Structures are given as C-alpha cells and as structure tokens.
C-alpha cells in the first residue's frame, strides 16, 4: 500500500488498528453487560470445569501473545536492513496489523471464557491484554524504536514530517 505522507500512513494504520481492537472489545462489553443484568447464564456450572477453562483459556491467550511477540520481533529485525524508509514502513504497516490481529485473537479467548463461565477473572485478564495492547500500539515512537531509525529518518517518522528541514 502506498501512502502520500507519513501523516496519512499513521492515520490509516491507526484506523485499521482501532477497528481490529474494537471488534473483540465490543463483543466483550456486550457479554459483560448481559452478564451483569442476568441475561447471560454460564454454560459451565461446575467449579472444577470453570477452573479448567480459566487455566486453559488464559494459557492459550498467553501462548498466542508470546508467539505473536516473538514472531513480530524476528520479522521486524529483518526489515531493519531494508534500505528504503518507505519500504520499511510498508512492511511495518502490515506487521503492525498482524500484531494487532494476534492480540485481538488473544482477547477473543477472554470473551469466550466470559461467555462460557461468567467468571470475573476473564474481565481482569481482558484488562491485562488491553494494557499489553497499549504497550504494543504502533505509534511513531514505537516505529522508530522497532525499526531502529536514526537521524533524519527518525525525525521524519517521529514528527510525521514529509521533508527534511
């Protein structure tokens, strides 16, 4: 995807990341509100089964988050050697979307756990995932850090400038 400016680049990246983030968040909020008003009944009633779902879904989410983090770290290291800033940013764009998709999948497991068990633990775990998401958000500062930008390239991306000077 080609961008006419760095401002447009981050504008489009943010919009896509917001959409990816808001979809599971909307589902989670809907399920949580239904649970609070008593319209959502737990599909799993036995305490032992609830514990199994809590441990299982938390472990799956942690595995997804860890895998996404390690894979993205390796991919981003590879694109640091690409000579053109535009090409690096294009790769970073797609990798950032993939990172957000992975985090959305992990948060969807928390919504699934809430739906199955009505356990408040999944609300806490969802909040932890949202905090992790905020730390992984593809901001200009994060892009500079991930891509190891220095000098003029760093200034252009960090301050969303289209030209030097």
Question: Each predicted region: which residue ranges?
Answer:
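Alpha-helical transmembrane segments
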Residues: 47-65
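Alpha-helical transmembrane segments and their immediate juxtamembrane interface regions
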Residues: 126-162
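Membrane-helix interface/capping segments
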Residues: 65-88
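Alpha-helical transmembrane segments of integral membrane proteins, especially early/N-terminal helices
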Residues: 11-33, 161
């Amino acid at each position: 995807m080609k961008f006419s400016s760095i401002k447009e680049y981050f504008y489009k990246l943010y919009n896509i990341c917001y959409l990816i983030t808001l979809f599971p968040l909307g589902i989670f909020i809907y399920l949580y509100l239904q649970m609070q008003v008593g319209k959502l009944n737990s599909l799993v009633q036995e305490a032992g089964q609830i514990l199994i779902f809590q441990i299982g879904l938390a472990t799956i989410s942690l595995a997804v988050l860890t895998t996404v983090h390690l894979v993205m770290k390796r991919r981003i290291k590879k694109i640091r050697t690409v000579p053109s800033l535009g090409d690096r940013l294009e790769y970073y764009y797609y990798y950032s979307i993939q990172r957000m998709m992975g985090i959305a999948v992990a948060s969807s497991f928390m919504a699934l756990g809430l739906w199955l068990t009505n356990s408040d633990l999944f609300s806490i775990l969802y909040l932890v995932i949202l905090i992790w998401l905020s730390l992984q958000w593809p901001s200009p500062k994060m892009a500079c850090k991930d891509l190891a930008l220095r000098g003029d390239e760093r200034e252009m991306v960090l301050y969303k400038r289209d030209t030097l000077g």
